[in-house]
């Protein structure tokens, strides 16, 4: 009889636990991820102009004419710390003289004659952690090469970095962009309507 009482009590206890309503706590995690906002010289879109004056007398006796480089500076300011890269698009790609990932087209003259090409070199790169910090000199990386001065490869992204695969985070990014044209030797005998008409777009991207 004693044994039966124990069994009965055990069954009642289990049944009571099954019927009881347990308290529940729902844990919810909310929030938003806001990417940084970056501008170039305080604007979303700017034009960097390079003007070259060329005369027939500047051409060598034979071969193409290589002009001296001209420089423009860029400064990208972000409202939060980020990594910064950019890709390049040659809007005159069909007019490139010679085949190279480094050459950008300079347009056409006499309907279908190519003016030449130009290269863009990125140098004097710096990054500031914020507006009150000192600028830190860094290098340029395209994912496979890392140098203090690097010619832009149209097929790769350029980045402010401290090594090939190590991008540098910050809020203020600066660099000089050197443009150096090479003009076709055929321009010496052109009809006079030739002009340099290079046009490229640098599209910046940033990440947390």
Model features per residue range: what roles?
Residues 2, 20-208:
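Mature extracellular/passenger domains of Gram-negative fimbrial/pilin and adhesin proteins
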Residues 2-8:
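Sec-dependent signal peptide recognition
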Residues 15-17:
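N-terminal signal peptide c-region/cleavage motif recognized by signal peptidases
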């Amino acid at each position: 009889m004693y044994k039966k009482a124990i069994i009965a009590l055990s069954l009642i206890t289990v049944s009571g636990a099954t019927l009881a309503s347990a308290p529940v706590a729902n844990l919810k995690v909310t929030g938003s991820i806001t990417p940084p906002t970056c501008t170039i010289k305080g604007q979303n879109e700017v034009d960097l102009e390079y003007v070259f004056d060329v005369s027939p007398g500047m051409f060598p006796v034979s071969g193409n004419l290589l002009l001296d480089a001209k420089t423009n500076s860029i400064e990208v300011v972000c409202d939060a710390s980020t990594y910064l890269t950019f890709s390049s698009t040659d809007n005159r790609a069909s007019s490139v003289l010679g085949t190279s990932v480094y050459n950008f087209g300079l347009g056409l003259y006499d309907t279908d004659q190519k003016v030449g090409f130009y290269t863009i070199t990125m140098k004097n790169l710096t990054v500031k952690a914020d507006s009150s910090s000192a600028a830190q000199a860094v290098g340029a990386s395209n994912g496979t090469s890392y140098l203090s001065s690097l010619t832009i490869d149209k097929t790769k992204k350029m980045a402010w970095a401290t090594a090939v695969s190590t991008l540098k985070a910050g809020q203020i990014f600066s660099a000089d962009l050197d443009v150096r044209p090479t003009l076709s030797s055929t321009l010496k005998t052109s009809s006079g309507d030739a002009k340099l008409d290079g046009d490229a777009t640098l599209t910046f991207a940033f990440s947390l």
